[in-house]
């Protein structure tokens, strides 16, 4: 779809959407996004120029259907997939991708660390994906030195980052905010450093006693991103891994650095979003969102959860969707889903489905609470179908139509029950929605009540 759009940009030194927006240019991607979001295209351009919205759209991802991430648009959901050395392969990951897109993932991150040739897996995912693809290049950098963290060099990082950009990755998590001087701040944490990328960088700094190479070479990464229009997803390496560690000095120190890096990328017209926690008690979620907006000049916030309790392994798609809904309400732009397997193992296709639906619920609830234009229309349409016992329409409007129909048909599978004015919960005699009060009856009742009130007042 984008081949013709991109052809005229090739060879330019900066092809980012922010670069064009700041020149007053409205790109084809901006027009496409405006139509999807039902927003004025001038607003899209202005938000991208300001940095409050990104359109992750690598010029080498030609089959991408452009979307946006920002506070002015609908709250988005990311789904993580990826093969590991112990489980899964390319075919399983492609099936997860298709399921994620089917159930509404706005972006997908390939977090593969093994299970086959990483370049082959990534390229297949990009070529098969209509949604933006994100990656964490440090994983492949570590694999390239066979897990020997101390052998990694800045050039290793830059080589892998450019390779991902050339392959068409739309945004990358770059763990540039964790600095050497912040490492002692994790001493009093219960769970230390829980970011995989952050842990790799921390071990590198502890071994070499040198500053984070992603920080010292940040300008080199900017130059790569400009050439391909890759968006930064600035990784929160020191995000809290439990409630005890939430909003501590380590987390907030890194956040301040992420804000500085955001503005440095903006100086070169490179798009940025900022990643956030993690595990956060409900009473601290608003603070975390507002603090990010303050430190990072309102760059889009992209949070993992956050989980609001640590005691429910196997159900962390629920514990985190609670926090995600609140974070979205307070202004978070994109929610990274959590599956039931979080903290327990690699998610399978069914886990992807369950995690994604939980997060589509959270994002939609946030949009309704923020009074986004048209956000509640689908709710009202489904409620109308429910009141009128239009079962097939209810299924159609559901976030997961297959699951809704499956549960209905467990007890009433015959087609005749698709027009029945009851379900198996109440049966044919006790469903309250059968109580249809017509307008004439209400008019008569109002007359009676008015007359009764008049009689009482006269007495």
UniProtKB/Swiss-Prot annotation:
Say if the entry is tagged with keyword Iron: yes
User: Pathway it belongs to?
Assistant: Cofactor biosynthesis; thiamine diphosphate biosynthesis
Q: Which GO terms describe its molecular function?
A: 4 iron, 4 sulfur cluster binding; carbon-carbon lyase activity; zinc ion binding
Specify which residues bind [4Fe-4S] cluster according to the UniProt entry for this protein: 423, 426, 431
Positions contributing to Zn(2+) binding: 279, 343
Q: Which family does the record assign?
A: Belongs to the ThiC family.
NCBIfam families in the record: PRK09284.1, PRK13352.1, thiC
User: What protein am I looking at?
Assistant: Phosphomethylpyrimidine synthase
Source species = Gloeothece citriformis (strain PCC 7424) (Cyanothece sp. (strain PCC 7424))
């Amino acid at each position: 779809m984008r081949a013709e759009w991109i052809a005229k940009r090739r060879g330019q030194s900066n092809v980012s959407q922010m670069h064009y927006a700041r020149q007053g240019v409205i790109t084809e991607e901006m027009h496409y996004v405006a139509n999807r979001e039902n927003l004025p295209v001038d607003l899209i351009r202005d938000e991208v120029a300001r940095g409050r919205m990104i359109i992750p759209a690598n010029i080498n991802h030609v089959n991408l259907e452009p979307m946006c991430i920002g506070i002015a648009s609908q709250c988005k959901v990311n789904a993580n997939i990826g093969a590991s050395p112990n489980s899964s392969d390319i075919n399983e990951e492609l099936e997860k991708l298709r399921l994620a897109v089917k159930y509404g993932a706005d972006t997908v991150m390939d977090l593969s660390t093994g299970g086959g040739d990483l370049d082959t897996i990534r390229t297949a995912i990009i070529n098969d994906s209509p949604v933006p693809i994100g990656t964490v290049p440090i994983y492949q950098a570590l694999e390239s030195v066979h897990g020997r963290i101390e052998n990694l060099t800045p050039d290793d990082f830059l080589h892998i980052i450019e390779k991902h950009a050339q392959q068409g990755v739309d945004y990358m998590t770059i763990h540039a905010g964790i600095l050497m001087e912040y490492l002692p701040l994790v001493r009093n944490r219960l769970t230390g450093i829980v970011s995989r990328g952050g842990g790799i960088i921390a071990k590198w700094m502890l071994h070499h006693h040198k500053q984070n190479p992603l920080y010292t070479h940040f300008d080199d990464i900017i130059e790569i991103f400009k050439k391909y229009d890759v968006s930064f997803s600035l990784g929160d390496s020191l995000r809290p891994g439990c409630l005890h560690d939430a909003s501590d000095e380590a987390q907030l120190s890194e956040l301040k650095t992420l804000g500085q890096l955001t503005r440095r990328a903006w100086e070169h017209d490179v798009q940025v979003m900022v990643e956030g926690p993690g595990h956060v008690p409900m009473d601290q979620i608003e603070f975390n969102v507002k603090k990010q907006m303050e430190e990072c000049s309102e760059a889009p916030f992209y949070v993992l959860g956050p989980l609001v309790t640590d005691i429910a392994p196997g159900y962390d798609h629920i514990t985190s969707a609670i926090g995600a809904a609140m974070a979205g309400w307070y202004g978070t732009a994109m929610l990274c889903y959590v599956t039931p397997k979080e903290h327990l193992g690699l998610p399978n296709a069914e886990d992807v489905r369950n995690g994604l639906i939980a997060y589509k619920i959270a994002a939609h609830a946030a949009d309704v609470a923020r009074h986004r234009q048209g956000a509640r229309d689908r709710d009202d349409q489904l409620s109308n179908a429910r009141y009128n016992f239009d079962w097939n329409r209810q299924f159609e409007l559901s976030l997961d139509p297959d699951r809704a129909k499956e549960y209905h048909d467990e007890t009433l599978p015959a087609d005749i029950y698709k027009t029945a004015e009851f379900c198996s919960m109440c049966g044919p005699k006790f469903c309250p929605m059968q109580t249809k009060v017509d307008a004439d009856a209400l008019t008569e009742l109002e007359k009676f009540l008015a007359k009764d009130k008049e009689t009482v007042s006269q007495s």
